[in-house]
């Protein structure tokens, strides 16, 4: 994705260029089985298992800003971000049912079951910006040039621009969610 916008802020023209590449992947696997044993009180056994993995990577998002034709010195105006996210989920479920025939033509059907679910998430973001540091960073003839001519290895020095990390503590996290459940019920049908 490439985006350029023009805007008016306090009477000056603003140009924001954003370059973004995002990779997404989803893998899902499921197995299930249904088993019926009519000679054993109509016993039914159902099971299911699933695994899902989803990933999102944005390896080098770039956002650059020019204010009134000059390379912007705003902290949020010149950024490079590296993002990675991975979600995993797995679930196992078991269900059992039997039929019993009672007095007065009643059918008693007990059902029991079990579910185990586990979900994890791992998110990592690294943020970098360019600090205006020395005389090169204040040279107007340099700041009006295209980005490829401003941020060259010769200009990323103590006399020009410094790369600084802007990653926040909340940009990286891990999360887990585990659930284990049992259920039981009885259904009685009167004929």
Features from the language model and the residues they span:
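Outer-membrane beta-barrel transmembrane strands
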Residues: 1, 17-60, 78-127, 162-191
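Flexible, surface-exposed loop regions and adjacent strand-edge segments
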Residues: 2-12, 61-71, 121, 126-136
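Flexible, solvent-exposed coil segments and beta strand-coil junctions
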Residues: 4-15, 67-79, 158-168
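Flexible glycine-rich, low-complexity coil/linker segments exposed to the extracellular/periplasmic environment
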Residues: 73-74, 124-175
């Amino acid at each position: 994705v490439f985006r350029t916008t023009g805007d008016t802020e306090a009477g000056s023209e603003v140009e924001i260029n954003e370059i973004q590449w995002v990779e997404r992947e989803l893998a899902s696997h499921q197995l299930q089985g249904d088993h019926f044993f009519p000679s054993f009180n109509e016993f039914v056994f159902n099971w299911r298992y699933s695994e899902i993995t989803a990933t999102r990577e944005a390896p080098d998002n770039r956002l650059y800003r020019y204010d009134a034709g000059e390379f912007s010195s705003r902290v949020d105006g010149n950024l490079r971000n590296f993002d990675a996210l991975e979600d995993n989920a797995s679930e196992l479920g078991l269900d059992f049912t039997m039929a019993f025939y009672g007095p007065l033509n009643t059918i008693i059907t007990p059902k029991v079951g079990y579910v185990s679910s586990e979900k994890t998430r791992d998110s990592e973001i690294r943020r970098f910006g360019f600090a205006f540091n020395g005389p090169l960073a204040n040279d107007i003839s340099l700041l009006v040039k295209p980005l490829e001519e401003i941020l060259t290895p010769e200009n990323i020095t103590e006399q020009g621009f410094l790369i600084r990390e802007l990653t926040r503590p909340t940009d990286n996290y891990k999360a887990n969610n585990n659930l284990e459940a049992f259920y039981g019920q009885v259904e009685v049908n009167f004929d």
